[in-house]
């Protein structure tokens, strides 16, 4: 984010964002911070030690570390120590609220957001949560209930995990993405049968492991007519890069294999088909850029959130779901071959993905924040 003036120079008042320290939480927080600062708000981010590594993406001096801990209910002997850290974070937030006098507190999930949201309720400050996934995370469920968040901003429709009463507070905004993603969007053009076909494959650490093992085997099953024009870019674990590249070369395919792509939005825009997991940011970015994708949700994930994310896009016609446990190289190769030569289906799916995307999500979320900031004193809306 471009650096700006200090908080004393801002005239709109202060908004506090609270986020866990992972990209899935921090990307939308960063996008909202950009939108709010453009509207003359002073934005402060409260996060944990991991989130402090993102300081260079926010305005100088606007990121503050608070005490926090994940609650591991499966190991109850650790809970007292973990709870004490959350209580310490709660007290830290109350002290900082007295100094900052925020108009609104916005939680983006992750346990570091919990003490911030609880402190907002105690201090009588308006609050809202933004849920990135189609299934509410634990921290946001706590924030919406015990934290008494007045607004629940959702990225997907339908949204699962909240009570019927809490659902009355839901507002569909979409999941804010980085400006780099918005700038990468351009019309999709399916390639002719004799033109190069760009396949992009990526996932998180577990996705990278599975795709590194599976995708070269799938490609080896493809007809020569498909292999001849196929170009692959794939995210791999560092220890897998050489082996994956060699497997593709043995199949006659040119492959760019890296552990990290710093130009991922541009790679997505250049792709004709994407094979990926279905994390919230991934689905949001593919929608904004408008590219057809085969989604392979992370199996056995908590609450099946990735499956629900992918189902939202599939219902909109913007992609296809394949379940990892059911996939075989032969069956997947048959699906891929059909799509490779079906320009109409690829184009139709790309358009549907784009229609499902929300490039204005950050602005819609900023609108919700400002509506709260302009309202009166918070009312108790927690479940009875």
For every predicted segment, state its role.
Residues 345-359:
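A short, well-ordered alpha-helix in the C-terminal region of glycosyltransferases
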Residues 2, 358-384:
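C-terminal alpha-helical cap of glycosyltransferases
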Residues 33, 37-38, 44-46, 50-60, ...:
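Donor-nucleotide binding loops and adjacent catalytic segments primarily
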Residues 62, 92-105, 113-128, 141-146:
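Glycosyltransferases and closely related glycan-assembly transferases
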Residues 42, 50, 121-186:
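Active-site-proximal region of nucleotide-activated glycan assembly enzymes
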Residues 17-30, 209:
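A short, glycine/small-residue-rich beta-strand->loop->alpha-helix junction that serves as a flexible
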Residues 102-104, 269-284, 291:
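Acidic donor-binding loop of glycosyltransferase active sites
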Residues 12-20, 37-88, 173, 238-240, ...:
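Conserved nucleotide-sugar phosphate-binding/catalytic loop shared by glycosyltransferases and other
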